[in-house]
Every structure is written in C-alpha cells, then in structure tokens.
C-alpha cells in the first residue's frame, strides 16, 4: 500500500467492538517490549496525551503518541514528536489488511502499537476512545481518566465513568482530572479499589493563576509554573494531569526531571479544542459538544472579558441540546446549575449578542424548529 491507500483503508473500516484476544492477535511480537500510558475519558484526552508526550520527548525518552480522531491516521501517530514514518505505517496496514478484519478503533490502535514496537519505543501514550481496548495492551504502569461528562449517547455519567475505568489495571497508577463530578469520582474510586489500582486526583487548590492576558495565562501547579495557551481551568487541569502522570512514571522507574516537565508543558502549542483563527476580527473555533465543554468555552471568554460576539452553533441532534444551551449561557454544568438556584434562563450575562443555529442540510425541519425554540429560551 501507499500511505494514501493506508489512510483510506483505516478510514473505511466500520465501527464496532473487538475482543481482547482479537486485538492481541493483531499485535506483533515487538509490541510486548513497549510500556503504554492509556488515556480514557470524555473530554481532554488529546491535550493530556499531547502534553505528556511532549514531556517524554523533552526528557529524551524514545516514545510514541497515538491520537484518536478523524484526521488521516498518518497524522495521528507520532514517534519522538515527529509523524510516523510513512513506509512503516504502510507496511503495518498491509499486514493488518491481510489478517482478520478489526473495527476501526481497534485496528488503529493495533497499527499504532505495531509501529511503536517496530520503532523500538520505550513508552507510548495512546488515546482510548474505547477504554476496554486497554486490556489488550501488554504493559501499562500508568494510565489516565480525563474529564467525564455527557457524550450525547444518552448514557449516564456514572456509566461513562465505569466504562472509562476500564483503562485501570492491578498495580498501575491512574491519574484522573481535578474537579470531576462527585458521582464520577465515586465510580472511579470503586473501580480502582476493585482492581488494585492507585488513583491520583490533582488537588484543585494547588492550581493558581499567576497572570492572565487576553488569551494566555501562566499557572502554577504544585510548584510547576506553566504557560498556557488559553485561560480557563480546563487547560490548567490538563496540565496538572500531565504533571501527575510524569510523577507517576517516576515512581514506576522512569527518570523524568522537573526541567523536562516544564520544557514539555511549554513546548505544546495546541492545548485545547479552542482555536483562535483570527484576532482582528476575533474568530474562535471550538469543537465543544458537551455541556462541560460549552461551560469551559464560556469561562474562557468571560475571563478574557470578550463581549458583543456572535455565536454560530452547529447541532446534528436534539439529544442534550437543552443542557448544552444552558451551559453556554451560564457557564455552569448541569450539576453546578442544580446547586446554583440564582441562574434564570435568558438572564445571564454572556459574550454573545446574537446566536445562530445551524443544522445539517436536508435534515429534519421540525427538529430544527424545536432546537431554535430551545435556543431562544436561553439567548
């Protein structure tokens, strides 16, 4: 295969679930020599994985990085902070296509792991859209569960937390996000206790914002001073997780210095799904899709003192829309709104003067009308 054919092969694979045995069978022998850090959760997986990989690179550890997502796979597998060798990935795709077909998530993870094994990586940081795939990975001294919240598939946050906890294993150290909902944290504590995994929760009180500009800030976490690309506790929480993951790896025998942690955190440019496309006029693109992510976006804009903006919101379904609009209006998640009785729909001060709703072309006109009415209730 060419690299274009390899990317097309993985992109065309169907969704679905693979058994642990199926995935293990797809691994080459060299994968057994790689230690993995699995990253599960609803939001923040990409940034947390990227930050940790940057720290490993700064330390000089021969490490791989795999991001889940929809970009071509060749752009989502990195080794030593550089895209994977195209010839290596093409050969890996050839081998996988000749064996038993796997669903897309499992096939991508197998391809990434096989590339890391062939390259002789010591460590590899991998995003896990399905935490159940973690069981097939040979060694995982440290793992992570990022922020857990509604995913638009009508599953409770407790159920989502239990699924994300599938990344844990006996005698591993799992770092989770600060300020998880109580119900989520309870599920993670129970899961960690059952499998004999140590759970580390960064203390939100250890996060201190030292200075702030319009779209940048400097944060101290436990003595580590970190420049962040954006304001907001979500970015600071991801940095705190990366620090704790590095310290956990130190406890597992890896040598990671404080200087490497600081250098790695400072080196990463894209730390969030929020992207500033233009400063003048100010144009921001955010891939938020959950109430938690909508609240995080609003908090960033409020901290930056941005006003008189227009928002263009694209929705493909009605499920979860009410909670999303409410969080984008108030900056509060559904759990926080239950505690704060002072918030009334349509009465909160926020950055948006106008809000435009966009739904897929050729979609359900009645659904669009219902979504519009929901939006009018808040803006």
Where are these regions (language model features)?
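Aromatic/hydrophobic pocket-lining residues that form π-stacking "cages" and hydrophobic walls in ligand
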Residues: 52, 112, 188
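Short functional linear segments
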Residues: 1-41, 48, 54, 58-59
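ATP-dependent carboxylate-amine ligase catalytic core
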Residues: 58-141, 153-157
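Beta-strand->loop->alpha-helix junctions that form or flank phosphate-binding loops
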Residues: 66, 176-179, 191-213, 229-233, ...
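C-terminal helical cap/extension that packs against the catalytic core
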Residues: 179-196, 282-284, 325-379
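Hydrophobic alpha-helical packing residues
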Residues: 52-57, 116, 249, 375
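Nucleotide phosphate-binding/pyrophosphate-handling subdomain across enzymes
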Residues: 123, 133-144, 148-152, 159, ...
């Amino acid at each position: 295969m060419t690299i274009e054919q390899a990317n097309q092969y993985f992109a065309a694979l169907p969704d679905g679930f693979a058994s642990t045995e199926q995935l293990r069978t797809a691994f080459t022998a060299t994968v057994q020599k790689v230690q993995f850090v699995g990253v599960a959760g609803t939001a923040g997986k990409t940034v947390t994985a990227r930050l940790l990989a940057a720290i490993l690179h700064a330390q000089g550890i021969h490490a791989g990085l795999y991001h889940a997502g929809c970009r071509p796979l060749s752009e989502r597998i990195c080794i030593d902070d550089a895209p994977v060798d195209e010839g290596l990935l093409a050969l890996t795709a050839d081998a996988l296509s000749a064996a038993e077909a796997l669903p897309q998530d499992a096939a991508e993870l197998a391809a990434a792991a096989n590339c890391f094994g062939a390259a002789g990586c010591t460590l590899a940081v991998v995003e896990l859209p399905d935490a159940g795939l973690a069981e097939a990975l040979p060694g995982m001294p440290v793992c992570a569960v990022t922020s857990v919240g509604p995913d638009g598939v009508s599953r409770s946050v407790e159920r989502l937390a239990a699924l994300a906890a599938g990344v844990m294993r006996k005698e591993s150290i799992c770092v989770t996000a600060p300020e998880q909902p109580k119900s989520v944290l309870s599920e993670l504590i129970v899961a960690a206790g059952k499998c004999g995994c140590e759970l580390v929760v960064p203390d939100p009180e250890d996060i201190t914002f030292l200075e702030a500009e319009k779209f940048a800030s400097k944060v101290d976490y436990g003595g580590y001073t970190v420049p962040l690309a954006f304001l907001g506790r979500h970015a600071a929480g991801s940095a705190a997780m990366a620090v704790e993951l590095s310290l956990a790896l130190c406890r597992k025998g890896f040598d990671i210095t404080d200087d490497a942690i600081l250098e790695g955190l400072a080196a990463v440019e894209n730390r969030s799904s929020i992207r500033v496309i233009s400063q003048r006029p100010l144009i921001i693109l955010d891939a938020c899709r959950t109430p938690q992510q909508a609240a995080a976006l609003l908090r960033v804009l409020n901290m930056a003192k941005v006003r008189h903006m227009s928002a263009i919101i694209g929705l493909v379904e009605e499920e979860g829309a009410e909670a999303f609009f409410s969080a984008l209006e108030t900056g509060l998640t559904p759990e926080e709104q239950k505690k704060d009785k002072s918030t009334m729909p349509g009465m909160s001060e926020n950055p948006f003067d106008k809000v435009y709703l966009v739904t897929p072309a050729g979609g359900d006109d009645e659904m669009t009308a219902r979504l519009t009415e929901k939006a009018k209730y808040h803006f």
